[in-house]
Amino acid sequence: MGSKRRRATSPSSSVSGGDFDDGHHSTNIPGPSRKRRRLSNLPTVDPIAVCHELYNTIRDYKDEQGRLLCELFIRAPKRRNQPDYYEVVSQPIDLMKIQQKLKMEEYDDVNVLTADFQLLFNNAKAYYKPDSPEYKAACKLWELYLRTKNEFVQKGDAEEEDEDEEGHDSQELSSPGYLKEILEQLLEAVAVATNPSGRLISELFQKLPSKVQYPDYYAIIKEPIDLKTIAQRIQNGTYKSIHAMAKDIDLLAKNAKTYNEPGSQVFKDANAIKKIFNMKKAEIEHSELAKSSLRLRTPSNLTASKLTGPSSQGKGSVGDERNSSNKYFRNKRSAQGDRLSAITMALQYGSESDEDAALAAAARYEGESEAESITSFMDTSNPLYQLYDTVRSCRNNQGQLISEPFFQLPSKKKYPDYYQQIKTPISLQQIRAKLKNHEYETLDQLEADLNLMFENAKRYNVPNSAIYKRVLKMQQVMQAKKKELARRDDIEDGDSMISSATSDTGSSKRKSKKNMRKQRMKILYNAVLEARESGTGRRLCDLFMVKPSKKDYPDYYKIILEPMDLKMIEHNIRNDKYVGEEAMIDDMKLMFRNARHYNEEGSQVYNDAHMLEKILKEKRKELGPLPEDDDVASPKLKLSRKSGISPKKSKYMTPMQQKLNEVYEAVKNYTDKRGRRLSAIFLRLPSRSELPDYYITIKKPVDMEKIRSHMMANKYQDIDSMVEDFVMMFNNACTYNEPESLIYKDALVLHKVLLETRREIEGDEDSHVPNVTLLIQELIHNLFVSVMSHQDDEGRCYSDSLAEIPAVDPNFPNKPPLTFDIIRKNVENNRYRRLDLFQENMFEVLERARRMNRTDSEIYEDAVELQQFFIKIRDELCKNGEILLSPALSYTTKHLHNDVEKEKKEKLPKEIEEDKLKREEEKREAEKSEDSSGSAGLSSLHRTYSQDCSFKNSMYHVGDYVYVEPAEANLQPHIVCIERLWEDSAGEKWLYGCWFYRPNETFHLATRKFLEKEVFKSDYYNKVPVSKILGKCVVMFVKEYFKLCPENFRDEDVYVCESRYSAKTKSFKKIKLWTMPVSSVRFVPRDVPLPVVRVASVFANTDKAEEEKHSDTLDDSKVGESILHLEKDKEDVPVEMSNGEPGCHYFEQLCYNDMWLKVGDCVFIKSHGLVRPRVGRIEKMWVRDGAAYFFGPIFIHPEETEHEPTKMFYKKEVFLSNLEETCPMSCILGKCAVLSFKDFLCCRPTEISENDVFLCESRYNESDKQMKKFKGLKRFSLSAKVVDDEIYYFRKPIVPQKEPSPLLEKKIQQLEAKFAELGGGDEDMEEMGEEEGDITETPSMPQLQTPLTSELDIMPYTPPQSTPKSVKGSTKKEGSKRKINMSGYILFSSEMRPVIKAQHPDYSFGELSRLVGTEWRNLEATKKAEYEGMISGYPPVLPPLQGPVDGIVSMGSMQPLHPGVPPPHQLPPGMPGIPGIPPPGVIGQNVSPMVGTPAPGAGPFGQQIGILGPPGQQAPPPYPGQSPATQPVMQQPSTPMFVSPPPKTQRLLHSEAYLKYIEGLSAESNSISKWDQTLAARRRDVHLSKEQESRLPSHWLKSKGAHTTMADALWRLRDLMLRDTLNIRQAYNIENV
């Protein structure tokens, strides 16, 4: 688990049972003396704990709306966004910095933390305005901080405490009986308090911790105390006042907070107990004595009784609590029965031993309550419980519980690295929970989880740590107990079978297996039931739940003879109708088959049936095979188990183990077309003694046995871990072996099988990369909708008033029209790819509204409000740059306030002047109207004004609202507010007032919404005869309309007014102050306030119809426009280059072919002859003579690098090459992005498609062909005019998947083509496949990993795959049986290959081989028989030599070393016959033989020539050869082809060569050259300079092929020629002449 971690939550004063002797502090001690001792021993307050508590208090504080105030101070403003902040604040600090200092424990004093918080809040007050939320939050939090700090850091005076306590004593000593009841009530309040989830808060405070388990507790805490002690003191009458008990409660809480870490549960519980006690104390002090005494009854005593007794007696205190409860109820029933006092209960309990205390501590630490111990749900005789309890209660020699660190998992907060290393964490608490839920069926399953827990601890901790040693000890104990239980189980099983008695164990096993089968069927059924369609979420099983109706589908029951549905299957599962799982699967398949048979192919039901059957198969495959039923075994089998020593192998496998096993088996069991198992040679590594150079070349050897052992030991946390080991094994084989070898090919094929298997198992689980384009468009859409639907308190949308803004600003007539409606269409058509462009368009509309309207108008205020709201929602959606980093975020609310204030300063003087002129004009118009009305007639001079008048039995007053007859008959009556009433000289009554307009009487846009029954106060006033009044109505102000209603008026006659309407400007403005005359109507409150409902305009329907009418033509005209993305306005940004070339104009940002490019961008470049275009990065760009160019590094794809085919690459990985080029911009195909590994996981540029985003973490060096990681690409600092990319950050980093090398498939095809034309080996390969059983039974001793490669390598040699003892016998037996079949294909190939080569001179070797093979297959049988007859005429190959090499020349009948070598006068395939030159294998009689026996390992043949041995097993060797020591190494030198190069570079002339030839002649030497020196030369001993390499005869070979350099290819040619020389000598029996 972790020796690295400390206990996250320590026990307070009570984690364990009470083995502590309470005598020294539970005796009756007088209050004052005890208090003095406490003062002397008072533990100091931990400043770090106080600092943590203060920080948490500030962090968790919320205001009235539930918002965390600390969010405003989590991070200081960014310098880029708010540079003026750093002009005001010299020492910036934020909560993140304070938290970091807390974690690093830099605060050793509370005053240091106080200084930092003061600096934080002072900075906020200095920068923000007093009315801002930040300023107010800073003030609130600072007050909270000081208040909390004063609570923690108290400076009490001992003398004052003494005086207080004496005062309390004097007041309370007079009534000791009543005091005891009060104290019991306080104790009860503390003891029974629970948290919201029902957990008992006081549980850990009832008993002191064990001295054995927590000795440090008593070293830190000088005055331990628990609730049991407090209860005893209450019963003993130790407390003389409430204050004395309060002191002990404070001490209890302080002890817990001193010992435990801040933030732990115990720390919080201590504060809660103190708070509960104080609240109860205050309640009692303010209550009446009588009521208090009535409340104090037996429950308090019962609570004290529980606390005074030990927490665990026997097997727990459950029974004790029950007994005490019974006594309580029994005493309550008796009328005059004595109460069960707490002290009586205290005497009933004895003290615990340290053993019980430690166990109780462990039980509580694990989170088990006494009433819920493991024995309550499991029999102690159960083997599962016994194994678990043995591990859990394991102790060391000192009696300490060594399993304690494994009770709970480490804290994720403190040990995040634990959860990174350990993929499947598990603890004893989780194992206990699984035991409780009966999830373990066998001991093996429980053992698997315990082993997983131990392996996790061993994996995380170092071997010499204490935890690691504990793990080893516990594993030994567990294994010993497991063997004991298994042995006991076997004996019991055997006895029970003999006696034919049914044991409980056997019945439980049968029952559990039956339950397991039923559970599996339920899982499979639920998998089908819960399957849903990926796109729509539709349940696929809906049409399969019940059979079709016979009434609706009568033909169904004629076609389908056996109907089946899911309801019937579920019924059968519930009632145990199915004998096994197969029966249920058969019914499922029948149901799907019926659906496919009845419905047409391609229909929804048909497709659903297919999909559900696939899901069912996958789920069944995931569950794995059914466990075998051991219960049906015969008695003999049962008895035989007793003699078995090894325990049963576990049949229980986790889903991950099943996947790992499936991958391993797929690689192990793969066979080729001939049935040959390719993995046989990879099972085991060669020994160091046989092949030491293998371990020099390969640094990390691995074989399949090692992989299997890791898999069995659960060392693989996931499939990728196993795949890495397999890839390393195949890479080792490819590194050591030659590229043309069969082993090399087998490694590549198995590598491909491995990747395909993993893809099948994981379902090609490539990490899902979010679609950034859709996310940006969704963000913009959400932002637009939020802004457009933003409403005020009355439910009015602010955007309604802005809909009336003209699309074109008169000040800028050339600008394209832009309105919210246009923006909405752009958003719906997903034309925005950048947030800053969307923000520019929105702000342009809002700023136009501000420019064109007065500062006191409704439109202006709404525009400002919407702009503020836009910024707020934008920052929330982008999380201030944590989700989306955009230049748009640089415009903040502060910038908006500055712009608005500046605008108001410019406009206010003009508006004041306009108001003044308007008032003068209105005054003149009023005077004119009075003059005109005065001159109209004498009647106006004789007006009689009054406050009311009557008409048609109705009385009208000033302030009343009336309906007035309309001017036209088809119109609604006008609404007028009466302001004046008079009667003229003619006796006619008149009224004068303000007209109110209905919405249809105003000019407005169809998008505007109105309140129901809304009217508008107009600027139109006029007089009307009273005779035209049609009736009364009421117009109410909006603030009263929803709450009040007028008396004696119908609802139809009541209207609401919120705004005034100006007929001149055709605009609306909210009414802030209702100034209409007071009405005589009486208003009463509404029973239920009216809801605020807004309705669409009457013009909306007609406008919508017109819009639909023209929508088709609009769509046709703008179909292209909707597809095109909107681009942000950019400009060419020139830059001065100090070292630039003359005539070149350099740019940081440039537009080329409608494509905007900037320095640092990556682009696709035209690349001729490559599969994919290369990627270049622009580091400079310039224009010269009208042509544009750029310069920068080039990135290459994996297929352009040299690497082993087994290498894995990330998808879309590129490599930075050494090549830096200057390219014309005409070769640019498009833009792309190349990200570092870290950025590739976390973010994406928003304007680049995911297909064009690449990953680069390595640089490829062309000279040494190496890939090395580098820090990162060069970054550029560009001017402000350059438009930065917007970056979207993922909420969760993606996990990039790797893919095989692009060379893998090509290399496999090449090698298959090469080996395909070697038809002579077909039958031998089949024989090898037949003999493979021996190979798999005993893992092979790998052979040569550098086999010689040519057409002769059709039957490589594999040594006997058994122990050294059996080598001799098997060699003789198999060697006598084995015959080497020489096929006529070899002779046919030697004749046909030159012909095909002449016809197709450009074909490669592999292509020629395929054509030769095709010709051979198409050849008539008679022709084939002729070739077979010709080849049979050649002498057979003799068995390989068993003797030493000496004297080999004298053996006249020597045969070729390798079977299948061409016979005399037979041309090897592909080599045309040349007249005058003998074919290979034919040497003149005058050639001298070359004899020599080099020492083992001296020279290349020790590792490169096949070793003679029994040819019985011919598996291809991927690993170095392993031969018995008795077998000789056959070597035969040949005429040297190369001489070691001179140490210095020299010019070799013909004359110099001739002189050296003369010097080399010697009478003592039988040969002209020093062939023995040449034979001993090795590749690794010869180092050539570049000049020497350039002078090599590279023209001998067409190309270097699969070799790294031309020198390697020539060395390979030399080895082949030497081998051919040896074979020729042996095949043709060449003797000394």
UniProtKB/Swiss-Prot annotation:
Protein name as annotated: Protein polybromo-1
Oligomeric and partner information: Component of the SWI/SNF-B (PBAF) chromatin-remodeling complex.
Function: Involved in transcriptional activation and repression of select genes by chromatin remodeling (alteration of DNA-nucleosome topology).
Gene name of this polypeptide: PBRM1
Composition bias, Basic and acidic residues: 900-931
DNA-binding region(s), residue ranges: 1378-1446
Annotated source species: Gallus gallus (Chicken)
Record-level GO cellular component terms: RSC-type complex; SWI/SNF complex
Source lineage: Eukaryota, Metazoa, Chordata, Craniata, Vertebrata
Single biological process term from Gene Ontology: transcription elongation by RNA polymerase II
Acidic residues composition-biased segments: 158-167, 1320-1335
Key word Transcription regulation present: yes
SUPFAM superfamilies recorded: Bromodomain, HMG-box
Entries under Gene3D superfamilies matching the protein: 2.30.30.490, Bromodomain-like
Source taxon at top rank: Eukaryota
Subcellular location: Nucleus
Gene Ontology terms for molecular function: chromatin binding; DNA binding
Residues annotated as transmembrane: none
